[in-house]
Swiss-Prot record:
Residues 164-173, 199-209 have a biased composition (Pro residues). Residues 162-214, 394-413, 476-550 are annotated as: Disordered. The lineage of its organism: Viruses, Duplodnaviria, Heunggongvirae, Peploviricota, Herviviricetes. This is Envelope glycoprotein E. Residues 541-550 have a biased composition (Polar residues).
Length: 550
């Protein structure tokens, strides 16, 4: 029998038989040296045709320790299942064959026609193995069929043979402490071998009844309890949900936040089982977790989250889900939240939904509980094993395993992308508006500068400002005495020797009664005195137009 046939046979035993309503596969653990009775045959059929009963075994002693998992078949029904690598299995070996209804025999029960193992026998319609050994571990099956028809498997059991426990020797008199008082010494002397009476161990003291006292709890923080099915098998097109139960118990009055995070890992068909390294859940950045040796079949670290439901402001009096909640989920076709709970709902499930799902509970950003569920079809099912130690580091740096999120080809934009687009658009609009205002101000200032420069060119009289009254009306008086009487009306004194280090600017001081043109149409020429960059021993006088620059 090739390996494919062996795997198909196992799946038929573990899955198809359960779906067809036949007895489920059971697990049994025994110790070396015991006599084991397995797989009782169906009772006598009376007038029915004679049936052939066949017991066989598929050895699993080369597959290492087996880890059964509880698989949900049409919840809440659960059965223990596992997937065994075909490379470690051997061909099925027949053990015994009998016929029913039984023919009378000297020992009673079924008359066994063939027995292929010296330690096997059929007693009271059951297969009995005398003095089991570790090599007897395997998958035992019972098949029933007519004489002319092929046999049909009706029951199976996985037998795991463990080493026998080491017997502890009975206590000796030396194991008991002797009293230090004189009476104890007399008793020990009286019980010496010389006296001929061996010393007997003291009788056990009767249990003392302590008065009941109220329990005092010193626990602080939050305790989280989680219950998850280890596996869920579905058929394409079904609608089902994860049956996860989470209970958070607060031991003090402090507020806390809780996040329920769902992760998904692909399960390659080349893997006989998936390994979940618990240490990597708490320390995902370790080198062993980033590049495990069995990377395709290991759930060690991740880069994204499938779904998150966050609770904030929770306390002892306001536990989840009563505290404020916020949910986020990647857009995956056929996947949604089950109402307002922490469970996932699969609608019209397809084989693409198969995988290893992890549910991790964070309290104040620290892991408090986690569980795993293998969700797949019967053909894609692989067992998941939790490993406590760190994985072995791979020789080459492999890409870390991470949850796979299958987004649709044209996924709608999320709210975060919409908000980012709105902010970017507003920023661009404000930038364009600011540039427009800056350009207008620059153009206006340039035009104003040209106008002022043209007025100062000296081509003709230019009046920057026309006042409605004479600016120097008080200075236009011919009476020098009047100016002397009012000190603050006196014109500024002219220095006789201006500084030779002047800035080059001309300070114009009026000396005429008025600086405005006369009404008869001609311009008045008034004497103006200029101070500036001339030599200190010389005073310059020049005539200027009747215009003043402010």
């Amino acid at each position: 029998m090739d390996r494919g046939a062996v795997v198909g046979f196992l799946l038929g035993v573990c899955v198809v038989s359960c779906l067809a309503g036949t007895p489920k596969t059971s697990w049994r653990r025994v110790s070396v040296g015991e006599d084991v009775s397995l797989l009782p045959a169906p009772g006598p059929t009376g007038r029915g045709p004679t049936q052939k009963l066949l017991w066989a075994v598929e050895p699993l002693d080369g597959c290492g320790p087996l880890h059964p998992s509880w698989v949900s078949l049409m919840p809440p029904k659960q059965v223990p299942e596992t997937v065994v690598d075909a490379a470690c299995m051997r061909a099925p070996v027949p053990l015994a064959m009998a016929y029913a209804p039984p023919a009378p025999s000297a020992t009673g029960g079924l008359r066994t026609d063939f027995v292929w193992q010296e330690r096997a026998a059929v007693v009271n319609r059951s297969l009995v193995i005398h003095g089991v050994r570790e090599t007897d571990s395997g998958l035992y099956t019972l098949s029933v069929g007519d004489i002319k028809d092929p046999a049909r498997q009706v029951a199976s059991v996985v037998l795991v043979v463990q080493p026998a426990p080491v017997p502890t020797p009975p206590p000796t008199p030396a194991d008991y402490d002797e009293d230090d008082n004189d009476e104890g010494e007399d008793e020990s002397l009286a019980g010496t071998p010389a006296s001929g009476t061996p010393r007997l161990p003291p009788p056990p003291a009767p249990p003392r009844s302590w008065p009941s006292a109220p329990e005092v709890s010193h626990v602080r923080g939050v305790t989280v309890r989680m219950e998850t099915p280890e596996a869920i098998l579905f058929s394409p097109g079904e609608t089902f949900s994860t049956n996860v139960s989470i209970h958070a118990i607060a031991h003090d009055d402090q507020t806390y936040s809780m996040d329920v995070v769902w992760l998904r890992f692909d399960v390659p068909t080349s893997c006989a089982e998936m390994r979940i390294y618990e240490s990597c859940l708490y320390h995902p950045q370790l080198p062993e977790c980033l590049s495990p040796a069995d990377a395709p079949c290991a759930a060690s670290t991740w880069t994204s989250r499938l779904a998150v439901r966050s609770y904030a402001g929770c306390s002892r009096t306001n536990p989840p889900p009563r505290c404020s909640a916020e949910a986020h989920m990647e857009p995956v076709p056929g996947l949604a939240w089950q109402a307002a709970s922490v469970n996932l709902e699969f609608r019209d499930a397809s084989p693409q939904h198969s995988g290893l799902y992890l549910c991790v509970v964070y309290v104040n950003d620290h892991i408090h509980a986690w569980g795993h569920i293998t969700i797949s079809t019967a053909a894609q099912y692989r067992n998941a094993v939790v490993e406590q130690p760190l994985p072995q580091r791979g020789a080459d740096l492999a890409e870390p395993t991470h949850p796979h999120v299958g987004a649709p080809p044209h996924a709608p934009p999320t709210h975060g992308a919409l908000r980012l687009g709105a902010v970017m658009g507003a920023a661009l609009l404000l930038s364009a508006l600011g540039l427009s205002v800056w350009a207008c101000m620059t153009c206006w200032r340039r035009r104003a500068w040209r106008a002022v420069k043209s007025r100062a060119s000296g081509k003709g009289p230019t009046y920057i400002r026309v006042a409605d009254s004479e600016l120097y009306a008080d200075w236009s008086s011919d009476s020098e005495g009047e100016r002397d009487q009012v000190p603050w009306l006196a014109p500024p004194e002219r220095p006789d020797s201006p500084s030779t280090n002047g800035s080059g600017f001309e300070i114009l001081s009026p000396t005429a009664p008025s600086v405005y043109p006369r009404s008869d149409g001609h311009q008045s020429r008034r004497q103006l005195t200029t101070f500036g960059s001339g030599r200190p021993d010389r005073r310059y006088s020049q005539a200027s137009d009747s215009s003043v620059f402010w």
